[in-house]
Amino acid sequence: MTGRIQPLHVSLVAVPEASMSTLLGIHDVLAFFSALAGKDPALPTVAPFTVEIVGSERGRLRLANGLSLDVNRSIAEVSKTDMVIVPSVVVPDTGWKTGRYTEITRWAARMHSQGALLCSACSGVFLLAETGAFDGQQTTVHWGYSDHFARAFPRVPLQPERVLVVAGEREQLVSSGASTSWHDLVLYLIVRYVGATAAQAIARFFALQWHHDGLAPYIVFEGRKDHGDAGVVEAQAWLSTHFSVASPVEEMVRRSGMAERTFKRRFTEATGLAPIEYVQRLRIEDAKRRLERTDASVDEISWKVGYEDPAFFRRLFKRVTGMAPGAYRRRFQVPAFVQAQAAPRRRSRAIP
């Protein structure tokens, strides 16, 4: 530890929409130091964190997955804490409804004004953003919730491709992206307050991983379709099955009956991407699936998705995903030994 005697107090916030796996994962890692004391010289002999689950009320709380957990204390009982962490929360298709947990957001804002870190895992930043502390500060969230977040909190700059964002004048706003990026969050907190060697020891014990490549490889591109421009929606529908044809942008313009400049302007305003960028994203998304599910060569996949120049395809793929095609395949393709073991079981189930 860095000369500190008293452990840091961590308040892990539980609301009914919370993800139990994320909440308990964070809890177990930060609270497990005492159990590992003496097993690794890199770990402190005194637990660096005191972790408790807090909520609107103490007692039993039923979560979104139907399971329950015990809330150790109500926020009314917590007058000071060093760290507020909100785990993943379920965000409905209709988006995040603000104002449901005003007592929690006011409490979190008060703790932050007293010096506490505000930390979120995945979609937990929806709740913390209601404090106003993230206004004008970079943050990240699960890519699947990025549109909902942008609509709910337009004053918060969003970077869903980033795993971890540390912001604020005193670096006291910490957000992590997609679900298991809570690994990066807890490892960062351990590095910051205990040390890098301790974080490495904890990572080894729990098999936690830093997401060094960011979240861009995990993002599934779907394209905005709720913009209300019927002409653009029609073009998107056609493009979804014809993105690999030669000159797809020119064909969309021809089919739309609009002037080229008008079509491109409306398409960009509606989707947030220029037509050629939209085509590229669809092609790369199809290439990702082919890399994951087939053994086709990178050159063959390049041709299949519409690129005659495999070298250009490789450069574009890395620019969009942050990874080379071969590295992406190694990361996401089901391991050969698993496929080999699963194949006989699939065949046996297919026999009537």
PLM regions and their residue ranges:
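N-terminal functional module of multi-domain proteins
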Residues: T2-E130
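A conserved active-site-flanking secondary-structure segment within enzyme catalytic domains
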Residues: D135-V165, A201-I202
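Short, structured loop/turn "capping" segments at alpha-beta junctions
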Residues: V156-P160, A196-A201, H212-P217, V245-S247
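Conserved anion/nucleotide-ligand pocket segment
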Residues: V166-F205
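Short acidic/histidine-centered micro-motifs embedded in hydrophobic/aromatic stretches
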Residues: I202-Q209, R255
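A short, Lys/Arg-enriched amphipathic alpha-helix from helix-turn-helix/homeodomain DNA-binding modules
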Residues: L215, V220-S247, V253-S256, E260, ...
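Basic/polar phosphate-binding segments, predominantly the helix-turn-helix DNA-binding elements
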Residues: S240-T241, A246-L282, S302-A327
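…primarily DNA-binding HTH/wHTH and HhH modules…
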Residues: R293, S297, A311-P352
